[in-house]
From Swiss-Prot:
Region (C-terminal glutamine-rich region): 901-1127
Biased composition range(s): Basic residues: 387-407
UniProt GO BP: methylation; positive regulation of DNA-templated transcription; positive regulation of transcription by RNA polymerase II
Subcellular location, record wording: Nucleus
UniProt-recorded Gene Ontology molecular function terms: DNA binding; DNA-binding transcription factor activity; methyltransferase activity; zinc ion binding
Source taxonomy: Eukaryota, Metazoa, Chordata, Craniata, Vertebrata
Positions with biased composition (Acidic residues): 133-162
Organism expressing this protein natively: Homo sapiens (Human)
GO cellular component: chromatin; nucleus; transcription repressor complex
Protein name (Swiss-Prot/TrEMBL): PR domain zinc finger protein 10
Disulphides: none
Residue ranges occupied by any SET domain in the UniProt entry: 208-326
Length: 1147
């Protein structure tokens, strides 16, 4: 594959541009931005090419067309390569001269003026023509637009006449177009487009912590969540004034000053916080003082030079913070602390009881007291729950019908009659326990669940302890318990043997429990210390009393008044409930008949007449239900009129809550996240359904035990369509449209194939670079997700822009749907593919690769040394090989150029993240090309080098980029070097590869670098074998993706393992007549080799002999103990004296 075809996949070009010329302008300020302006007849926007200083990215602004900048030295001028067929030479003074020459990806001859004049002078003419032509076109367009605007204005406002100039008046609105002021809106140019300022909170409101909020109507600071005891707030901030300068505020706080502070301020008294200005104080000015010790939950005190508030009890959510002074601080401010009354002490004691008893609703301070109390329940009677009909289908109710959590249990009467029908002396029994709802009994199918029944309800049957039942077996006199149900046919007689002593004992226990519960309820419910003197109504909080006094009475004081009876109300909800009494509309309708009622209790009494054989019958489908709640729910769900219509689709619902739930389908918000797989859902029930279906234990176990079966491979395309695809598998003769499809194919079918063997997968990924604008403000983001988060946070309720992936193509006459996305294409970015070190998968970002490793290779995710850090070095080959001739002067062979250098840095950046890890051996083939007037010549020598990738400790730290701004103007200072052969000798390392050595490879501490020159032999130095390292051996991977340029670089990775490298050099000439002497070395690489080969050849010209290295004898003891395997022999040939070295620079 030649370079033109390969680059066209990355940089798409058009065939019609082959003969077009272009002018290039370099921006003098930066030196890294080049603007390409085409000079042909076609009208095309200019292209701006950015080549960053660190070589990290490439950007083209013109959209679908791409332009890549290559810089090449040609005798004091740089060549800029754009699309094929467009070449411009950039001179040292940042000016350009156009040229229409075909590009063969080789070194081009320098520009010479035909008449011998300065080439810079010929440049100014086309540039001047182009600029003049552009100015003329702009002037014509402006004149045309101005004429059209004037014609439109004349037709719209023919009768308008300008007003005479008005004197300055602050109430007039200035119009710049009219150069005059107007009383209101300008009659010609219309109103202005105002953009208001953002509202800025005061300092006091802006400093409010996130766990607190200020009530907008009542004032005061309230808690959003539970705040534990001993939580400190503060310090209080505000101006300090004297006591005589204090203004009205919630609480007065005094600050004690030291003697030094008083002398500085020239004061003779302490200062007070003035907490009345929101712009000077913080949020603590809104905390109101407590009126008694019961409502106090904060204490104020001074610590150092500041005043703090600390919670003295747990603050519950939606509870107001109330503060008062500490004991010592109260004396300092001449205030008294709140005294605790006996009733308040009882309430506080009850609040401190955090250990509840679930048998009798009592609470205790410690777990020991609760355990002692639970022991007393062993002697009490247990009550069986009576059986009832099925409920609403949501499981068993915990607190019985009609009782909400937190409400006291109901008292149920139990009548006990003897066998002869007479009532016993015990009369009625009060039970604190209320039964739980169970299944309906067959004898009692229908109940008015949820309705108030006028008759006495069915009574549960008590059960005595086992010891009591055993004692009753010897008693002759027994009693029979009879229930008093609502209907006589549903009486359930239950026989139980109870003596009179047992019944009296049970009654005494129940009375004790009842008295304890009543006392507990009195303390919590009936303590109302704040009473209204006008009507006698009492409240538990002073704020409630103040609110009641503010709207006391019926005339004039209440904000809301009934128009019919002049009754006053303090809330709209109370007024709406009251207005139902004056309306003729019956709110509560019976589902079985046309009757309607204005009160719910009347409806509850009415529906009992519709019971037929113990069941309620649906009036529409004749389905029977044993419970009224069930039939009511059935009618409302299936037979109600669907009056709530969805505005997005054709669905309708009978209830507004169902419509709100359905509207989540049309929204973009997904607030429910699956913690297992990360999938998001709009509704909680869908998340629950996903968890049950996808992440249940049975499915996970079946998925883990599933055996992967290989499917038979069937090619999907014919061989004729194979060449039309960009990404191809050459083993299967199969083509793919996208890179990811080829990667997935290789991972499944060819897992042993390496990425370096597939040229298509080494190409960079071209991704569009977009700006995402917020249509509600001036924010710009680089991703749609960040813009979406910004809109949801700062513009709640605003409509989100549509996603680019969900846009449908515009029809005829329709606007471009991309206009509604509020995005703009700013160019493209070439990013390197990031390869997984454990499989053939590759991704566009390192983040996705890390996620892949955590999911597919969890055993490697925990090992920090598995993921190798990419090398930060590159080989910049920039020294020419000097061909030594018989004459004194040497002819320089141009072995590299700035084009290759720029491509080196670009590929260095593109291949940073998937470079070969340490321990792999690579071969680099370097083919230099010489420059002459007759054109290109054949390569004069070839160098091969085998190196190991390792870190370097270079004494000279180079700059970040080797393509500098100054080199664009003057390429001469940049040195050029040729690759120097590095002969590597091995220290005393055992040749038998172990399992650990096979993983680590040849360590840099076991090899030593040296240079081979003419007439020298490699000598072993035993004292330098330890702690030695190899430098100048850094090579980037995947150079085969940039073939066909003037300097071709190819890579080959040898199989991993423990290798032994030896050298034996001979002097062999390559050509005759020009080369005086050439050094040739043979590298023998063997895996687990027992004996090192030594090869010596005689020089064909010059008779120079290079002796074998001396370190081979030290490795002889292990000759007979190892088994010889495959060998890799690579010949290295060097022209010249071999004195130059490879320069290693960091990008």
């Amino acid at each position: 594959m030649d370079s033109k075809d390969e680059s066209s996949h990355v940089w798409p070009t058009s065939a019609e541009h082959e003969q077009n010329a272009a002018q290039v302008h370099f921006v003098p300020d930066t030196g890294t931005v080049a603007q390409i302006v085409y000079t042909d007849d076609q009208v095309r926007p200019p292209q701006q090419v950015v080549y960053t200083a660190d070589g990290a990215s490439y950007t083209s602004v013109d959209g679908p067309e791409h332009t890549l900048v290559y810089i090449h030295p040609v005798e004091a001028a740089q060549t800029l390569f754009t699309d094929p067929g467009q070449v411009a030479y950039v001179q040292q003074d940042a000016t350009a001269q156009q040229a229409s020459l075909p590009v063969h990806n080789q070194v081009l001859p320098s520009i010479e003026s035909v008449d011998g004049s300065d080439p810079l002078a010929t440049l100014q003419t086309p540039l001047g023509r182009l600029e003049a032509k552009e100015e003329e076109d702009e002037d014509e367009d402006e004149d045309t637009e101005e004429d059209e605007e004037e014609d439109g204005e004349d037709t719209d406002l023919d009768d308008w006449e300008p007003d005479p100039p008005r004197p300055f008046d602050p109430h007039d609105l200035w119009c710049e177009e009219c150069n005059n002021a107007h009383a209101s809106v300008c009659p010609k140019h219309g109103p202005l487009h105002p953009i208001p300022n953002r509202p800025v909170l005061t300092r006091a409101r802006a400093s409010l912590p996130l766990v607190l909020y200020i009530d907008r109507f009542l004032g005061g600071v309230f808690s959003k969540r539970r705040i534990p005891k001993r939580t400190q707030f503060g310090p209080v901030e505000g101006p300090l004034v004297r006591g005589s300068e204090l203004k009205d505020c919630y609480i007065h706080l005094k600050v004690s000053l030291d003697k030094g502070d008083r002398k500085e301020r020239d004061l003779h008294e302490d200062l007070w916080f003035e907490l009345s200005d929101e712009t000077l104080c913080n949020w603590m000015m809104f905390v109101r003082p407590a009126q008694n010790h019961l409502e106090q939950n904060l204490v104020a005190y001074q610590y150092g030079h500041h005043v703090y508030y600390t919670t003295i009890k747990n603050v519950e959510p939606k509870q107001e913070l109330k503060v008062w002074y500490a004991a010592s601080y109260a004396e300092f401010v001449n205030q008294k602390i709140h005294d605790i009354s006996e009733e308040e002490r009882k309430v506080l004691r009850e609040q401190e009881k955090n250990w509840p008893c679930y048998e009798c609703n009592r609470r205790f301070i410690s777990s020991e007291q609760l355990q002692q109390h639970l022991n007393s329940h062993d002697e009490k009677l247990d009550v069986f729950s009576r059986t009832r009909g099925r409920g609403r289908g949501r499981g068993k109710r915990r607190f019985g019908p009609g009782r909400r959590p937190g409400r006291p249990p109901k008292f149920i009467r139990l009548e006990i009659t003897s066998e002869n029908g007479e009532k016993s002396d015990d009369g009625t029994q009060d039970l604190l326990h209320f039964p739980t709802k169970e299944q309906f009994d067959e004898a009692e199918p229908a109940t008015l669940n949820g309705l108030d029944q006028p008759e006495q309800t069915t009574i549960p049957i008590p059960q005595l302890p086992q010891e009591t039942q055993s004692s009753l077996e010897h008693e002759p006199e027994t009693h029979t318990l009879h229930l008093q149900p609502q209907h006589e046919e549903s009486v359930v007689p239950t026989q139980s043997t109870l003596t009179a002593d047992d019944m009296r004992r049970a009654k005494r226990i129940r009375l004790e429990l009842q008295n304890a519960a009543l006392q507990h309820l009195f303390i919590r419910k009936s303590f109302r210390p704040f009473k209204c003197l006008q009507c006698g109504k009492a409240f538990r909080e002073k704020d409630k009393l103040d609110q009641h006094l503010r709207f006391h009475g019926r005339e004039g004081n209440c904000p809301l008044t009934c128009d019919l009876c002049n009754k006053g109300f303090i809330s709209s909800t109370s007024l709406e409930s009251h207005m139902k009494l004056h309306s003729d509309q019956k709110t509560y309708s019976c589902i079985f008949c046309p009757e309607s009622f204005d009160r719910l209790d009347l409806l509850k009494d009415h529906v009992a007449i519709h019971i037929n054989d113990g069941y309620f019958t649906c009036p529409t489908c004749k389905k029977r239900f044993p419970d009224f709640i069930q039939v009511k729910k059935h009618v409302r769900s299936f037979h109600s009129e669907k009056i709530y219509q969805c505005t997005e689709c054709d669905k309708a619902f009978c209830r507004p809550d169902k419509l709100r739930l359905h509207m989540l389908r049309h929204s973009d918000r997904k607030d429910f996240l699956c913690s297992t797989c990360g999938k998001q859902f709009k509704r909680k029930d869908k998340l629950r359904e996903h968890m049950q279906r996808m992440h249940n234990p049975e499915r996970e176990a079946k998925k883990a035990d599933r055996i992967s079966r290989s499917k038979t491979f069937k090619p999907r395309i014919t061989s004729t369509d194979y060449d039309s695809f960009t990404f191809k598998c050459r083993l299967c003769m199969m083509g793919f449209r996208r890179r990811g499809m080829l990667v997935n194919h290789l991972s499944k079918r060819h897992p042993d194939m390496k990425i370096e063997e597939v040229p298509e997968l080494t190409l960079p990924i071209i991704k569009p670079n977009r700006d995402y604008f917020c249509q509600y403000c001036d924010k710009v983001y680089k991703s749609a997700s960040k813009r979406k988060a910004h809109i949801l946070k700062n513009h709640p309720g605003a409509e989100l822009p549509p996603s680019i992936r969900k846009l449908r193509p515009a029809g005829p006459g329709e606007p471009d749907p991309m206009l509604s996305t509020h995005t703009q294409l700013t160019g493209t970015i070439a990013t390197p593919p990031v390869c997984c070190p454990h499989c053939s998968k590759q991704y566009s970002s390192k983040t996705k690769m890390v996620q892949h490793i955590r999911k597919k290779h969890p055993e490697f995710a925990q090992l920090s040394n598995t993921i190798h850090t990419p090398l930060t070095t590159a080989v910049i080959s920039a020294t020419p090989a000097v061909l030594t001739t018989d004459s004194a002067t040497g002819e320089t062979v141009v072995t590299t150029d700035l084009l290759t250098q720029a491509m080196t840095e670009l590929s260095q950046t593109l291949t940073t993240d998937y470079r070969t890890p340490q321990g792999d051996y690579q071969r680099i083939q370097y083919i230099p090309v010489s420059q002459s007037a007759s054109g290109l010549q054949q390569p004069q020598h070839i160098q091969l080098q085998v190196v190991q990738v390792a870190s370097a400790t270079s004494p000279h730290q180079s700059q970040q980029s080797t393509v500098d701004v100054g080199q664009l103007h003057d390429p001469q200072p940049y040195p050029q070097h040729a690759i120097q052969v590095q002969h590597i000798q091995v220290s005393g390392q055992p040749l038998s590869p172990s399992a650990q050595q096979a993983q680590q490879g040849l360590s840099p501490s076991h090899i030593q670098g040296s240079s081979s020159t003419q007439g020298q032999a490699l000598q072993q130095q035993q004292q330098q074998q330890q702690n030695s390292s190899v430098q100048h051996t850094y090579l980037p991977s995947a150079w085969n993706s940039f073939r066909g340029y003037s300097s071709e670089i190819q890579m080959m990775t040898l199989p991993p393992g423990q290798f032994v490298i030896t050298d034996s050099g001979v002097a062999t000439p390559v050509t005759t007549g020009q080369v005086k002497a050439v050094t040739s070395g043979h590298y023998v690489l063997s895996e687990s080799q027992s004996e090192l080969e030594e090869k010596q050849t005689s020089a064909l010209s010059g008779g120079v002999q290079v002796e074998p290295p001396a370190h081979s004898d030290s490795l002889d003891p292990q000759t007979n103990s190892q088994q010889q395997t495959t060998q890799y022999i690579i010949t290295t040939t060097t022209n010249g004296n071999g004195s130059s070295e490879v320069h290693i620079t960091k990008p």
